[in-house]
């Protein structure tokens, strides 16, 4: 029975899904952003964030054995040695002051031709990016009444200045 399976199966076997996520993670680490389907991007996000957390933990370890163990765990997930090397040497530094939320997903406009799959762009969040913050102020409400018109005296004064200006130019 399929009780409490909170993971997108992506319509493939377990081995295929692991290999696909590994390849997508390697491409994301190598290039910084990739274009894929929305469902794959949503499945990739927690996978990549766990690997980045392992890289951050390895950098914080003083014992080299523990750091090597975390590196090998990441290597077993990503399976691309150059991507893991880049992650552990360069990429993790961008996320030193960030606790989670290392990736961002943008939905792209039109669906893919052929199978009408929703496309998305997944990318790393930059170190200096503050991210989206909800405003804590009150929401703007619509005015209940119409705006009051300007007083007739103010309108007459504005009209007089516009009429007087062309008259001065003619002299």
UniProtKB/Swiss-Prot annotation:
<feature type="compositionally biased region" description="Low complexity">
    <location>
        <begin position="150"/>
        <end position="165"/>
    </location>
</feature>
<keyword id="KW-0689">Ribosomal protein</keyword>
<dbReference type="InterPro" id="IPR000456">
    <property type="entry name" value="Ribosomal_bL17"/>
</dbReference>
<keyword id="KW-0687">Ribonucleoprotein</keyword>
<feature type="compositionally biased region" description="Basic residues">
    <location>
        <begin position="133"/>
        <end position="149"/>
    </location>
</feature>
<dbReference type="InterPro" id="IPR036373">
    <property type="entry name" value="Ribosomal_bL17_sf"/>
</dbReference>
<comment type="similarity">
    <text>Belongs to the bacterial ribosomal protein bL17 family.</text>
</comment>
<dbReference type="GO" id="GO:0003735">
    <property type="term" value="F:structural constituent of ribosome"/>
</dbReference>
<dbReference type="InterPro" id="IPR047859">
    <property type="entry name" value="Ribosomal_bL17_CS"/>
</dbReference>
<protein>
    <recommendedName>
        <fullName>Large ribosomal subunit protein bL17</fullName>
    </recommendedName>
</protein>
<comment type="subunit">
    <text>Part of the 50S ribosomal subunit. Contacts protein L32.</text>
</comment>
<feature type="region of interest" description="Disordered">
    <location>
        <begin position="130"/>
        <end position="171"/>
    </location>
</feature>
<dbReference type="GO" id="GO:0022625">
    <property type="term" value="C:cytosolic large ribosomal subunit"/>
</dbReference>
<dbReference type="GO" id="GO:0006412">
    <property type="term" value="P:translation"/>
</dbReference>
<dbReference type="Pfam" id="PF01196">
    <property type="entry name" value="Ribosomal_L17"/>
</dbReference>
């Amino acid at each position: 029975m399929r009780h409490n399976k909170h993971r997108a199966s992506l319509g493939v076997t377990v081995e295929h899904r692991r290999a696909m996520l590994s390849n997508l993670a390697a491409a994301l680490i190598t290039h910084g952003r990739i274009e894929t389907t929305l469902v794959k991007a949503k499945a990739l996000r927690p996978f990549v964030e766990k690997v980045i957390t392992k890289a951050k933990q390895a950098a914080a370890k003083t014992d080299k054995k523990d750091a090597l163990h975390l590196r090998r765990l990441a290597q077993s997930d990503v399976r691309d040695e150059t991507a893991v090397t880049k992650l552990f040497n360069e990429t993790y530094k961008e996320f030193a002051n960030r606790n989670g939320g290392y990736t961002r997903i943008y939905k792209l406009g039109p669906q893919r031709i052929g199978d009408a799959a929703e496309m998305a762009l997944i990318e790393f969040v930059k170190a200096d990016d503050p991210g989206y913050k909800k405003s804590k102020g009150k929401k703007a409400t619509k005015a209940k009444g119409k705006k009051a018109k300007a007083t007739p005296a103010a309108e007459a004064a504005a009209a007089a200045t516009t009429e007087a200006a062309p008259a001065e130019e003619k002299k």
